[in-house]
Amino acid sequence: LFLYDDCEDTPEVSASEFFYRWASKISSFLHEPSPFGQLYKCDTRLRPYGKSGALCNSFSMFDRYVRESAWVWERLALTRCRPISASTEWCYQFFRIWFASLFSRPFTPDDCREVVRMRFRIEQEKGVEKLKAGPGGLVDVEFIAQTLRLKHGKENPTILNPFTTAAIQ
């Protein structure tokens, strides 16, 4: 997920085009094979509006999307996000927006039912014999932790640690 501060366009290039180029270069670098293998697997589909959305979004676009349009699975994934930036202030700004948008709407019983449906879909696709995806496996632990973060994170921010074991404790 690539985000940037809301900023003005320049006569030479729009902010969205500038940051699109920047995000494309970083993504290519991360995917480029090296003698030691791929540096990092970066799934760029995890962004507002998926593959059809902009590769890099402004804070305000991200905020609006999460508040108004994000699917339950996207909100679950966002409970584990960790910003990477050279600027501590940018990270603080991101967390303020992230917290406000993620908890702008309650986690409803319908959302909980959707989590259960997602879990069963994964089990059907991966099979119950898989240690990670089978009953009681890592997928169950992750779904429980992420669901609890969305349900109780606003009132108890200490559970918002992106590391599952720390959040559960």
Regions found by a protein language model. Name each.
Residues L1-Q169:
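A nucleotide- and high-energy phosphate-metabolite-utilizing enzyme signature
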